[in-house]
């Protein structure tokens, strides 16, 4: 069953807010901007993560220098799952942030 438009937007909004909170509470030197539903996280080394919503597909997209990743929400687990690799969003972010910033953050709740 596909997510309703309202549920999809609520989930993406909550996910982006949780990401902002987590990054704000970290010791990382970064800048964030959330504009028109797109969350951009810029690290001090120039790399960035871009989170955007793809409403027609009901997906959360992540752009990183290593590529683009499309996540579907799994109602059973309550997690975003990459359609290509089946990796959880939180697991992928832990790896990417470690590679980009050298800090381990806990994205288990994402």
UniProtKB/Swiss-Prot annotation:
SMART domains, per this entry?
Frataxin_Cyay (SM01219)
Is Hydrolase a UniProt keyword of this protein? no
Keywords from the named record: Iron, Metal-binding
The GO annotation for biological process reads:
iron-sulfur cluster assembly
Pfam families assigned to the protein according to its UniProt record, in alphabetical order: Frataxin_Cyay (PF01491)
Provide the Gene Ontology terms for cellular component: cytosol
The yes or no answer to whether the keyword Metal-binding is present is: yes
Give a GO molecular function annotation for the protein.
ferrous iron binding
Q: Which family does it belong to?
A: Belongs to the frataxin family.
Purpose: Involved in iron-sulfur (Fe-S) cluster assembly. May act as a regulator of Fe-S biogenesis.
Q: What name does this protein carry?
A: Iron-sulfur cluster assembly protein CyaY
